[in-house]
Amino acid sequence: MILVAIVTYNGLKWIDSLLQPFLYDLDQLEIAVVDNASTDGTPDEIKKRYPFVRVLRRPSNLGFGAANNLLMEEVQAKECYEGIFLLNQDASISAETIRALADYSQQHPEIGILSPLHLSSDGAIEQGFAHYLPESPYHGFTELSFINAALWYLPRQTLLKVGLFSPLFHHYGEDLDYAHRVRFAGLKIGFLPHLTGQHFRPSTPISDEKTLRLKQAYHLAEAINPLLSPFAQFYRGHLAPFGEALLSRGNRRWPLLKMARNLWQMRPMMKLWRQRPPLDLEGLQRALDRKELPPLLLFVYNRPKHTERILQNLLQQPEITNTPIYIWSDGAKSADDQQAVEEVRALCRQFPKAQLHCQPTNRGLAHNIVEGVTNLLQTHDRVIVLEDDLILSPYFLRWMNDALSLYASEKRIAHLHAGTFYTSPKLRNNHPLYFAGSWGWATWQDRWQELWEPDGKQLLQQLERDPKLYQRFRYGGFMDFPKMLRRQIAGENNSWAIRWHASLLLHQKLSVNSNPPLVSNDGFDGSGTHSGGGGRYHTAVAPYPLYADPIAPTSEDPEAYHILRRYYARTNNKVMKGWYKLKELWQRYFS
């Protein structure tokens, strides 16, 4: 079976030329469309005219690569597929040609990407395809360094060996990066000249904006090109665009400088991408087989920009269409906050299928979290919790769902956390700690009902009776959590997290934490109610899937504890606190 993958976005005018070739010929083929939130009725018309097509409707535009990844993962996970054919919405090809490409590829396992000859609507070789061709004539398989992804056949073995499109690219450049990786894996890219497909790409002039986006995509692909040395990656990905910007004149300079800055700021994400782990096929299969997903509870207040961003992050999650969403909106403290609160609520009402709970008065974050989590866990056996100032990896829900499922019966684990701000190369994924991080977390009904203790004074007294646990709660004196708990008792803060942390430590219950982080906290920009800090906790989030370890941990990871303790020692001193305060002021007034 070959999966024909099509990504549509407002492609109504193309659907007949796209799908009619399969109307009476589906032999060995399955046709699937991922629709990127079209507004012209594309998915409805496809279902009406071509009912044999499987349509996956997305609530937002994922971009070309991420949308194709949804179907590419299916081919990775299921042995019934021998490969996948990526078909642009503005392209057309016969079912017979797709089967011929698959047959040839099966006979030549050294091929990673195989394509037909791309023709335009007038029968000539399509201009973009012709750009990469050697001089004719072409006889048999013709190897190239790159072919655009309008008409790609990828054997399943290519997907298992090379992986998916990189989420670093939203639109443009993802096929160039994938071609680099295919060649790095020792596979060939090429086309068969006796097989043809049509690509109806219009030959209109390219706008300055698109030219800039293409240029940035090219430099990004070069910055992570595994075929290049580290110096060549740095030169082509960063120095070259910066130099071009400096040498340019007039109106071109500032857009090019902005492009160079964007590429520079992506370095932490590029580093994570280079360090991505091999495919966890069992984890992927678990994810695709999982039908019932736990609810997600999001807390918001008066920051429309933060709320809009996290809602967009959620829409990028592959699992979001099957995830129950509950949003808890706090009431305004004063008339000055009322407009911002209403703007936030208006954004939340637009989120597909979300249930919005609006507090009539301002209750504060701690009260809302305790009330919201407690109420939701009366009807659900687990919950994922987020706040509005978090930045999410597109695979945040993937890891959370996996860990909640695998560790449900391991009572020594009471908490999951994806905001690993103390990240380190020595830190393993799924490391267990007696530490309850609150930036992207989850728990189970039985753990919350058994362990949540609202009385901070009682928790402190129990800790003081056990000197070993008390010192552990201080992290060697580098993070004075007992002081924070005393302030909560005195009413100087209303932290729920410090009480949850203390309770888990007293009961020797573990938290399992992701690494790399899947959540970053951006609430230390001076916009929040409780926190400043100049971005000390900001981290890049994993641009690839992580999965839980099927063997549940039963004791704390001592290396992870020492890494966390050293992190507090390094960042929680007077010099660093002063530095972070200066950064916070700079961000607040000059960014």
Predicted regions located by residue number:
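Short beta-strand-to-loop acidic/aromatic patch adjacent to the donor-nucleotide binding site
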Residues: 80-92, 380-391
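Short, well-formed alpha-helical segments that are part of the catalytic scaffolds
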Residues: 10-24, 303-318
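Acidic/His-rich active-site region of diverse nucleotide-sugar glycosyltransferases
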Residues: 66-70, 91-163, 167-171, 176, ...
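A conserved acidic beta->alpha catalytic loop
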Residues: 35-44, 60, 91, 329-344
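Glycine-rich, basic loop-to-helix element that forms the pyrophosphate-binding segment
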Residues: 58-78, 360-375
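Catalytic core of nucleotide-sugar-dependent glycosyltransferases
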Residues: 194-197, 206-237, 259-268, 532-548
